[in-house]
Amino acid sequence: ADDQDPTLSVGGILKAIGGNIRVGDSELFVAEACEYTNSFLHLFPKLAIILNIDADHLDFFKDLQDIRNSFRKFAELLPEDGVLVINQQIPNVEEITDGLACKVVTFGTDPSADYSAADIAHDEVGDSSFDVMHDGQKMGRMALSVTGEHNVLNALSAIAAADILGIPFVSMQKGLKEFRGTNRRFEYKGTKNGFTIIDDYAHHPTEIRATLTAAENYPHKEVWCIFQPHTYTRTKALFDEFVDALSTTDHVILADIYAARETDTLGVSSEQIAEALKKKGCDAYYLPSFEKIEEFVLERCQKGDVLITMGARSEER
């Protein structure tokens, strides 16, 4: 936007550039960081955005408080003339922000945030739009080409950062309207027998809930979710949260856990998640192979349904 020419290094494949790395010709360097193994503590940003803080990577961190402590250390890396843009909806956000040397700017759906969203709406294909409010004053209307309240929050954080950098609002409108997401983030894959197939990388309960909530704004009769949990550690530690998040949709199909870097020593399984969902009255199934899952959905999914394949996924998926 606004003829900026940043260098980019992000985790997902950006559809706009067909990759996750871009070498620009300006002083702007935009990097997507991760807290796993405290890798983000090796960065020294001038402007940083914290979107959320959740219990994750519990094979490395002891608990949520341990994760929050790392985010506090990350925030402390910002210099006095730096800016931290942070989601106001993070619980006890002051624990992260109080006493920092840098300036703190908040965003969220509550009007008390420095940058907030009002009158959120969704069009016939689920794409979001909202009024951007800054310190109680309307900056303008923002229309996105992606769906879900989580993307409204993502956009707000980008708007705050762009405003701090002096980028005009009209350029933000153009840039965010042209942004069509990344691969494996509510990615439309096509149709089969009249039902729509969406693929999503969500493998944490918070991400799952956000994706399934976004699906409710997408045209559909019923939503089917195929979920493959990622790592035994995460599945064991967040078992109840997975059940709660998955219970928000119409039908759930569980594939075997993708072990990734781990071995099965914790006695947790996808079948247990399916049984827990059934006890909550949910329509849930565990199927032991992707071949059986394919047969099942081709038999059950109807015209007008939406099928979401979800998870970090294994090689054979």
What are the residue ranges of the model-derived segments?
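Short beta-strand-centered segment that lines the nucleotide-binding/catalytic pocket of NTP-utilizing
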Residues: 4-16
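Structural beta-sheet core signal
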Residues: 8, 48, 86, 106, ...
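Conserved motor-coupling elements within RecA-like helicase/translocase cores
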Residues: 22-25
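Switch II (G3) loop of P-loop NTPases
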Residues: 27-36, 197-203
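Acidic, Mg2+-coordinating active-site environments of NTP-dependent enzymes
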Residues: 45-197, 220, 271-275, 282
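Glycine-centered, small-residue-biased loops immediately flanking beta-strands
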Residues: 82, 250, 305
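Active-site beta-alpha connecting loops in nucleotide-dependent enzymes
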Residues: 182, 206, 212-280, 289
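Conserved small/polar residues in nucleotide/adenosyl-binding loops
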Residues: 316-317
